[in-house]
Amino acid sequence: MASIRILIGSHLCNATRALREARALAETGHDVTIQGVWHDKKLVARDETMLPKVPFHFVPVVDLTRHGILPRLRRRLGVERWRRFRRFSPAGLGYGVREHLKLARAAEPDLTIVHSTGTLWVAAKLNELGRRVGVDFENWYSEIIRPEEALLHPVTEIRELERKLLRVAHYRLTPTRAMARALGEFAHVEAPHCVYNVFPLADLNAPAPPATDRRKPRVPSIHWFSGRIEPGRGLRALFGALPHIQYPVEVHLRGDLNRQDKAWFAKNVPAEWRQRIVMHPTVHNSELLPRIASHDIGLALESGATRGRDLTVAKKTFHYMLAGLAVIASDTTGHEEIAESTQGAIKLVQPDNPAALAAAIDAWLAFPEHLRLAKLAAVRATKEIYCWERVREQLLDEAALALAD
């Protein structure tokens, strides 16, 4: 079988899409290695806990927790070189970019698949050397940069890397059909294949401690989660909606709240809700599903403020559905793509519209039977359409074609 390298820009434990890809390819018989970057000691510990259990290899090309001075300096110089002089440096795209290239080049794999902005440059360089490369467009990288941030990033250079790789890569994936169509039109090529960011049904049977976040089991519960509790990701709309909700409900937020965001949080949460919002820290991925499942409604309120964000589906949307929650999601092109097929599991609301969000929440709280049916619809849609077992073969077919070409 083939030797395959998968390049990610961060920790293994946070790279759920690359993890599933690597596992599927390894289970088919390929020799798979993921190259990543370590920058956080807590996440290093999570990675090290995972490694004995996975059927592939993992190599951190840079470990910033031990030898961070030079890699951080290179990254800073790359960023400043662009910001001050408008001169492009691949180091400005992420940590360990050149280290990724050096290791992937020396390994001489049959296929190298990249998953981040910085590794786009690596794939382009490998292609120039005659190597076979692939790209998983987890995001449309040049199109997730907000207009006010554009001067800080080499958008044109990233866009040219994307266009080139869409034309030369042997393996091309996106997380939605809408993004696939848009990328195909952008590069004037056949659209990449869509593999949704869905989860395995087997996760429902994984051993995990029973967990509940709820205070009052008889009161319906809303759940929102992210790595950080910060401005954006729909929290402004949620806080604006809370005073307008007419029915009893618990609101649970999961994520880390750092010092700089605490002031924003205190200022924006309605005074009458400050003691009623339940805060939870992040947990290991293995603990997250049972905690989500203890709630009734999941919120996926990411705004489609950029074209890239509009075309994708928040991964948490599929996580909520796997856990059996009804979902209220922002009315983006990506969410529209899947909402109709869920047959009532997802309500779409205009992004950043507190009144619309409050009305959507109340519509389910007012009619508990409707909420129950929506939760059942989420389970049904997950089992029939939006699970890893349904899309795994699409990924393997794409890999087989890439390796046979």
What residues fall within each predicted segment?
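Carbohydrate-associated surface elements
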Residues: 178, 198
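A charged, aromatic-enriched C-terminal amphipathic alpha-helix characteristic of glycosyltransferases
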Residues: 352, 366-399
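Conserved acidic donor-binding segment of nucleotide-sugar-dependent glycosyltransferases
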Residues: 341, 346-354, 363-369
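Membrane-proximal helix-turn-helix segments that form the acceptor-binding/catalytic region
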Residues: 94-106, 121, 125, 135, ...
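Conserved donor-binding/catalytic core segment of Leloir-type glycosyltransferases
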Residues: 213-243, 252
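Nucleotide-activated donor-binding/catalytic signature segment of Leloir-type glycosyltransferases, i.e.
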Residues: 219, 255, 263-292, 297
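Glycosyltransferase donor-sugar binding loop
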Residues: 39-41, 250-265
